[in-house]
Regions:
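Structural motif corresponding to the early beta-alpha repeats
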Residues: 115-256, 268, 318, 381-382
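Catalytic domains of carbohydrate-active enzymes, especially glycoside hydrolases
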Residues: 96-115, 175
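An N-terminal assembly and electron-transfer interface module characteristic of large anaerobic redox
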Residues: 11-15, 19, 91-98, 170, ...
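Short, acidic/polar
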Residues: 51-53, 90-104, 162-169, 325-331
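Asp-box/BNR beta-propeller blade signature and adjacent active/binding-site loops
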Residues: 37, 42-50, 89-96, 105-106, ...
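Histidine-acidic metal/acid-base catalytic patches
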Residues: 2-15, 19-25, 29-40, 45-85, ...
């Protein structure tokens, strides 16, 4: 077939070629990926569609200290397909755990975090966990520790619980796990969560929080209320009998006692602790004040025992929920080497501490690129978790529903990871 090019077409083609400049690759650096000297994107071991099991990141709804802040409970997750639909010929049948790992790896994610087993942790069991993930091509970089409510509340038996925490941390150090994350709640304010819908994105789900929320009959909520409480605003809910009410002074006293025993042992073990903020950062939660619901509280925490082992989980979403600029807050803690883990998400705030919406990572008030640049600037090299995916029909139709109202599943995590990687690559190149 003959092709006719007019003189004008030839001139236009030549001009476009000149504007295009050198061919791709001539002097243009390739984007950088996660490495030893960069932040590392991670997911929880249960984030890829299967059940969480013992290796997930979820926590029981309701009682304070047993919950894993920042990571949704398992929700309703589908079983793995054996072999995965559309997989290459010869792909073997997979266990649910193998299928999860395969999906995580397909997003280019090589690091995972998980909830830990019952304390005290055993070196052999931890090594098995790490070796299992390694066999999937994944590195376990963070475990959530819990099971020390007496230490949190200052009750009898706290010394025995702290002994078990210390034993667990030494086991972690022996297997080379770098970070242990934990919470310090008198009560986690999950009763204030509800689902909102993004009208612009045609019904995608957000997670709303309202300090004055009254539960509406017939709607699903993360926490169940008694009949007597069902007409009360969240802020007026009474303390639970097994938790009691606690002041800031009481909570600071219990965590100070904990840190002065635990941090020296963490230093010996070569392990960093990361305390997650109180999320939601409500001023009072069922009668108890919250020590990690303010930036001032975060700053006080790292001064109790001055050590890189005594750090925080920097959550830019919670930072904004409290009305602060996460870029400035990241700079404060990163410059002091006190960020031991990062949660990366976005929100819109109507009233700091009391009324906000957890939205898609690309549409909130946070400048996520500026946050990432600040982390890179201060040479943060540990994990970044793009948590709290939003609800999408694709996940809803497949039963992949996050444990938070308005939370999503694997498809939404793919969006979170892709956006986070774009921010990271741009920050590394800037």
């Amino acid at each position: 077939m003959s092709v006719y090019l007019s003189r004008r077409t030839m001139i236009q083609t030549a001009g476009l070629a000149a504007l295009a400049g050198p061919m791709s690759g001539a002097g243009t650096p390739e984007p950088r990926f996660e490495g030893k000297d960069t932040p590392k994107i991670c997911l929880a071991t249960g984030d890829a569609g299967g059940g969480f099991g013992s290796g997930g990141r979820g926590g029981a709804p309701g009682g304070a200290a047993a919950q894993s802040a920042g990571a949704a409970p398992a929700g309703n997750q589908p079983p793995a397909q054996n072999p995965p639909a559309g997989a290459a010929p010869g792909t073997p049948a997979l266990s649910p755990q193998e299928a999860n790992a395969r999906r995580i790896k397909q997003l280019g994610v090589n690091y995972v975090l998980s909830g830990g087993p019952r304390i005290p942790w055993d070196e052999t069991a931890l090594k098995t966990m790490m070796d299992t993930q390694k066999s999937y091509g994944l590195t376990l970089g963070n475990l959530m520790i819990q099971g020390f409510n007496n230490a949190i509340y200052g009750h009898q038996g706290r010394d025995e619980e702290i002994d078990r925490v210390i034993q667990s941390i030494h086991a972690v150090g022996k297997v080379g796990l770098p970070v242990v994350e934990y919470n310090w709640y008198a009560h986690r304010a999950t009763e204030g969560y509800f689902e909102e819908f993004d009208d612009v994105r045609t019904g995608a789900g957000w997670t709303g929080f309202d300090y004055e929320l009254v539960h509406t009959p017939g709607r699903a909520y993360m926490a169940r209320l008694s009949d007597a409480e069902s007409t009360m605003k969240f802020k007026d809910l009474p303390p639970l009998a097994n938790e009691g009410a606690h002041t800031l002074d009481e909570m600071w006293a219990t965590i100070t006692y904990f840190l002065k025993r635990v941090i020296p042992e963490a230093e010996k073990a070569g392990v960093r602790l990361a305390l997650h903020p109180n999320d939601p950062p409500a001023p009072v939660s069922r009668g108890s004040q919250q020590i990690m619901s303010s930036v001032e509280g975060w700053k006080h925490l790292i001064e109790i025992v001055r050590s890189p082992a005594n750090g925080i989980t920097f959550d830019c979403g919670v930072t904004r929920e409290m009305g602060h600029n996460p870029v400035e807050v990241a700079a404060y803690f990163a410059s002091r080497d006190r960020i031991n883990h990062v949660h990366f998400r976005n929100v819109r705030v109507k009233k700091p501490y009391e009324r906000y919406s957890e939205v898609f990572i690309d549409e909130g008030e946070n400048n996520m690129f500026a946050v990432m640049k600040e982390l890179v600037k201060h040479k943060y090299t540990r994990l970044i978790y793009p948590e709290h995916p939003r609800a999408l029909d694709y996940d809803r139709e497949r039963g992949r529903i996050g444990g938070y109202p308005g939370g999503g599943g694997y498809a939404s995590f793919a969006f979170q990871v892709g956006y986070t990687r774009a921010m990271l690559q741009a920050a590394l190149a800037s």
